[in-house]
Amino acid sequence: MGAALPDFPKASYEAGTYALGNGAFAYLQPDGGWGFSNSGLVTDSGEALLIDTMFDFPHTRAMLDGFRAASPAKIRTLVNTHQNGDHWFGNALVEDAEIVATARAASAMAHETPDLLAGFLKAAPGMGLTGEYFLHCFGRFDFAGATPKLPDTTFSGRLTRNVGTKIVELIEVGPAHTGGDAIAWVPADRTVFTGDILFINGHPIVWAGPIGNWIDACNMIIGLDAEIVVPGHGPVTDKEGVARVRDYLAYIRDEAKKRYNTGMKPFEAARSIALDDFAGWGDAERIAVNVATLYREFGDTTAPSDAATLFGWMAQLWKDKK
């Protein structure tokens, strides 16, 4: 059935399953904004490796149904590229599979559960502008009954898994976007699944840093010479898309450093950085988190790292642009 699927790069960015060639598939969720992530499937000889589940059970079921229609291969391994819930909260729906993540990601996943997010959503109506923004970001997801299923295999550095005759290379590149980021490189398919090291046509969000690690990860991906690059969010891309994200990260680093050196506070710095070159990208308010993370990296011990403050800052920028 895979031959009947829309092929990259001919198809537009629409929801559903895409055949990437040689038994590799991607499942995309436009518009790629908050919570609308991508998954990947590598198949060979009746076996499959799944890269990431979705934010909730309904979206994960849709993804699994799409992949089953594309390939009957049995999912024997599930890789979670990092700790954010939109890449692992659906794990429990993948039965009888080894679940793999970096040790750093697995440690964080134990504390970042669906119940925690469901609690924030319940409280959001009484949280003013921050609550309004939180509902804007996450109100379309249903975490009812979403029991967390954590990785049972962890690694640091590199790990390989076989899928039939194919080798999948799991490469730790964090801390960058989060503390435990990894990518999945499939040389036989000339395809790399990057998790949230790549947001295509959307502003990346630097929860952890250092940003130099993220830039290095982009350069590593470019060096793999992959023909197809599946990001954590957004449409399938190539090396040019990777370079564009790398250049964004370098730009905000340099602009934030200029403002840090003048003594400007991080929120005002975030407000003042021109984003005209990235005007078509979604979720521009994430610049607030990125600048706060950069300021901490530069040595500002007062720059916030708590989610409540950072979501409040993003909410204010979101309101300003409405």
Give, region by region, the residue ranges found by the protein language model.
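C-terminal regulatory/interaction regions
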Residues: M1-P6, T262-K322
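Metallo-beta-lactamase
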Residues: F8, A19-L20, A110-E172, A188, ...
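Conserved beta-strand hairpin/beta-sheet module of binuclear metal-dependent hydrolase folds
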Residues: T17-G66, A182-G195
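Divalent metal-coordination and catalytic microenvironments
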Residues: G23, V42, D52, F67, ...
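Active-site metal-binding motif and surrounding structural segment of the metallo-beta-lactamase
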Residues: S45-A48, P58-A101, I222-L224
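Active-site neighborhood of phospho(di)ester-bond hydrolases with catalytic His/Asp-centered motifs
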Residues: I51-T53, R76-H82, V100-T102, V173-G174, ...
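Ligand/cofactor pocket segment of small-molecule handling proteins
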Residues: G157-L159, V163-I221
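Divalent-metal (often Zn2+) His-rich catalytic cores of metallo-beta-lactamase-fold enzymes
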Residues: T191, N213-S272, D276
